[in-house]
């Protein structure tokens, strides 16, 4: 039996798909003249397989995204069919006695470097495509295992070292029964994705990829924190009983979906859902979300080879606004960087990406990206109750610049007779100690705050939440983090405004009563967490929650705070 960190509740039975590709090892020795024909054949066979794979991906991309995105892979296929590429590779094999793989690598890398030297930004970015195509071609020449995430077409439990946002953006998620990873934490991307999909996940197992083999039968039990590999029929039957009880309780909680989160003494709280795409709205509604407290727009930018244009973004935002039927939808501008990469943007490799060029810093430097997104949001605001949310704000100067950009775009839309909400609300993420400390200045510039506890905790405690060596130090209920949260809430209330929370702490059952007592106005979380959080709030009095929070904020350690909360809940 293997265990890890409980990331998303549930129980799944299924076969394992191990996301572990073979490493490319190229023989750069001079080949025997007798093997030249064989190496040329290897090149042609590798190219044939690559074209076949890309043709399948192209077809599926057209079905999913339409002809515009299909053309990207058409270009990839044309590059593979290029006669010049073929002639140059064969020439190196024949004249330099190079292996097919070594010759291909040399030509592909030469093409990529030539593109990188060009001044044209679009052409420079094509170097990424060339290397991607070359990587596929090399693996097929060497007959290595290639896992095409787009081509998963049967139900599996996905096993991986870790999963990046760009990887999960490619997966046909309807076939994923659950996630198990070597690395990760409750706030890692894989965990957040699993909760969004309402599928079980256990992360941080340490070495699951070294133990599980493809097609092993797996029981993923993230209720009792156990992973069983090729279990007996007896264990399968026992776990099915546990799953049935869990689903019964889950269905009972779903009955709360149409009820408000009101305390026993009449204090109402707004409960929202965090989403990453239009498809997540179904889960949000099913679980009783009263609003969308966070729309992570960066997922619209992932799993593709180019930036989404204004109309594509507009259609996505408009659809969500209409589906929510005049309930508020908070749209956060693109939060790329840190652990979220876009290969086609050629983001620089940084020593400390979480402290580097990310989120609003990219948008402010690349105004064309910011303007395209803001225009799409403003246009969509005519179709619902949309708010704008800017991430990673650390100064008054930043928010003033951004508000100025919004005003300029509003004037342009007005001049072109394009409708938009003239009174659209603007808020900022409080996710750095800097923004929390100067909240009294920032609140004068905006309509609301949204606290991002994942990054706020990471930056306050100087703990990389993705580093397993120090993950035990990551605790959003640390006294320092709680004091910052309380300060932010108090400042907003003093100025007659409100504060929400969209970090994972908002959906943590241990923190619900504490945050309620601290005066948090809106809780936004993975949809799967909403029914349980509603139940807790509806069973609690606001007056007793306030007393609990006041006491908790006087305690000096994580353990004392947690003990206080647990004693309150159990009595």
Swiss-Prot record:
The active site is at residues 189, 502. It is found in: Cytoplasm. Keywords: Cytoplasm, Kinase, Magnesium, Metal-binding, Phosphotransferase system, Sugar transport, Transferase, Transport. Phosphoenolpyruvate binds at residues 296, 332, 454-455, 465. GO terms for biological process: phosphoenolpyruvate-dependent sugar phosphotransferase system. GO terms for cellular component: cytoplasm. PROSITE patterns: PEP_ENZYMES_2. The reaction takes place in three steps, mediated by a phosphocarrier histidine residue located on the surface of the central domain. The two first partial reactions are catalyzed at an active site located on the N-terminal domain, and the third partial reaction is catalyzed at an active site located on the C-terminal domain. For catalytic turnover, the central domain swivels from the concave surface of the N-terminal domain to that of the C-terminal domain. The N-terminal domain contains the HPr binding site, the central domain the pyrophosphate/phosphate carrier histidine, and the C-terminal domain the pyruvate binding site. Homodimer. General (non sugar-specific) component of the phosphoenolpyruvate-dependent sugar phosphotransferase system (sugar PTS). This major carbohydrate active-transport system catalyzes the phosphorylation of incoming sugar substrates concomitantly with their translocation across the cell membrane. Enzyme I transfers the phosphoryl group from phosphoenolpyruvate (PEP) to the phosphoryl carrier protein (HPr). This is Phosphoenolpyruvate-protein phosphotransferase. It comes from Buchnera aphidicola subsp. Acyrthosiphon pisum (strain APS) (Acyrthosiphon pisum symbiotic bacterium). The lineage of its organism: Bacteria, Pseudomonadati, Pseudomonadota, Gammaproteobacteria, Enterobacterales.
